[in-house]
């Protein structure tokens, strides 16, 4: 089953909802254009959270959304206290400590049921929860890497034991589990694994053995009696979803892996780029009101959305984004500003620079360009 997402990998919780809605629809349009299928299930990049997201996905046309269970569980004071986990916008994540959540809820059906049943947001959007308590060991298994204190990689036997443990939990509390919902690029490459886990400048190295290991995951699951299913199938077969208004207690600005979406908004790159993005967005909104819908304004919105991509703002110190990521965002800002200039010309309001000044904005983009391009980026020698 295809799973839709924003066309541009943006942190939806950190940008104007209007931008988020447009790129969600753009993503669905792209799926339909190239495959003939319009996804019903949705993915939220990095599972960043804000209260408006269920409404955003519903308005875009999604019927269901994959949710992060760890940030949901950490919204319960008793789980936060039992695990000792906390959030900090300067922290990278709690990824390798989220097993503490599993240790606390493993014999508590009142919590397990959110992992083993679909639930419904107050607006009717169906939700399926994923957790690092299963996904993280599986990721380390796929990479064949060692985990901090470990001397040996995660073994097939450990994966089998984990799946066996969850069989009884599913039977006691629901009907399914979503064990692995992670970045797809880890199946075939190392993606940013070594950057995130070891602060090493190793990007997207080929990992062909991870493909074979992924097959082993599937074979192990089916040998234990698991049946493979899609998000829409488990929702259809599970009966009435749990009415879940507790999602309104998830902290604004958190994300998956026990991290925060606000970490992306608090890097030095975001602090330079985001005010410029916001100024251009305000210009688009003002010109839309003044001139009505124009193609140039939609082009500007698409270019601005691309400029808000998460990868030009992340990862935080001691690493950094890639120079090419930041360069692309700067180019997108120049393009968005150029489209606004054309929109004003075609509307005959070029001289009304109290509305928006493309000339002045061009110098502002150049100012941050000089700052950002003069830096040394992670991995550069």
Identify the function of each model-found stretch.
Residues 1-16, 23, 40-44, 63-68, ...:
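Short, well-structured secondary-structure segments
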Residues 12-15, 73-82, 137-139:
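Short, charged, surface-exposed secondary-structure boundary motifs
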Residues 20-46, 118, 166-171, 176-180:
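CE4/NodB-like, metal-dependent polysaccharide N-deacetylase domain
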Residues 41-51, 185-186:
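Gly/Ser/Thr-rich loops at beta-strand to alpha-helix junctions
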Residues 46-53, 72-76, 237-240:
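Beta-rich nucleic-acid/ligand-interaction surfaces
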Residues 55-59:
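Hydrophobic, small-residue-rich alpha-helical packing segments that form membrane-like cores
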Residues 64-91:
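Catalytic or ion-translocation cores adjacent to nucleophile or general acid/base/metal-coordination motifs
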Residues 83-89, 93-137, 143-150, 154-381:
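Active-site and substrate-binding clefts of carbohydrate-active enzymes
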